[in-house]
Every structure is written in C-alpha cells, then in structure tokens.
C-alpha cells in the first residue's frame, strides 16, 4: 500500500502542495503496478469536495485504475489520516506514506506510534519559495505532537 496524505483541493484541482504528492504517487504506482493507493483526507470548510475525492479524480485522470484507489474521506489531521487509513489495510501490510519532503519525518513518527511497523516515507517535492514557511509550520506541528 501507499497512503497519500491529503492537502487542500480546489475547484480547479489540487493545491500545489497536493499536486506534488499526487505526482509522486503516480510515479510510484506506475513503477509498482501491484500497489494499492489509499487517498486520505476529509472535506475542509473551504473545499468543494473531500480531499480523497479530489485526489482519486486526479489519479484517475493520470491513468491509475480506479480498482487500485481506496478513498478515506473522514480525516482532518495527519493522525487521523494514518489511523483511518490503517483500517483499510490488511494487518501487517507494508506501506509507504506519500507526503512532501518537509512532512515525512512527523508522518512516519505518527505511523509508527499507531502500529505501522513496516513503513517508509515517499518524499514529494515542495515549492522552494514556500519551504521556509512550511518548515516553520512543521516545526510547530512537531512540537505540538510531541507535547
């Protein structure tokens, strides 16, 4: 399995952060044709539909077979992404977490906390001009999670 962690979707498609994640997922899925992809993310107040639905549409448009895509459309946080996605997987399955490079460290910590022992990070790029802001936000999210 791979789990693509959600980020904002818009009427015109995924946000830049999410597009990086989805493009990395497409690359991985094309290289690993037996892998099932869980797209994980609920609907925020500023989103036209759930992140999972938007991600599934994008992957389908890029040629990924619908049978390989499992939507998880309730999550609002990274912890919920992991715990809700885990319920869709076979016990003891190996999993890759697809997220942006600045988010991999915390996502893997959370995954291990919730019992995903055979887990690895699949790092997508991020927009360089936003990287300082993203790193700062991630630092505070990490501190909050640790406390």
What are these regions (language model features)?
Residues 131-147:
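A transmembrane-helix-recognition feature enriched in membrane-embedded lipid enzymes
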Residues 1-136:
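A structural signal for short, hydrophobic/glycine-enriched beta-strand patches
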């Amino acid at each position: 399995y791979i789990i693509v962690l959600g980020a904002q979707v818009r009427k015109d498609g995924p946000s830049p952060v999410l597009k990086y994640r989805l493009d990395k997922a497409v690359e991985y899925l094309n290289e690993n044709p037996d892998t099932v992809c869980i797209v994980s993310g609920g609907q925020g107040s500023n989103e036209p539909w759930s992140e999972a639905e938007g991600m599934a549409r994008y992957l389908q448009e890029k040629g990924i077979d619908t049978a390989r895509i499992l939507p998880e459309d309730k999550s609002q946080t990274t912890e919920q992404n992991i715990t809700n996605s885990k319920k869709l997987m076979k016990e003891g399955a190996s999993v890759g977490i697809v997220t942006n490079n600045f988010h991999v460290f915390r996502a893997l910590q959370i995954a291990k906390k919730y019992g995903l022992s055979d887990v690895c990070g699949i790092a997508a790029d991020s927009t360089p001009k936003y990287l300082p802001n993203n790193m700062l936000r991630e630092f505070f999210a990490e501190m909050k999670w640790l406390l």
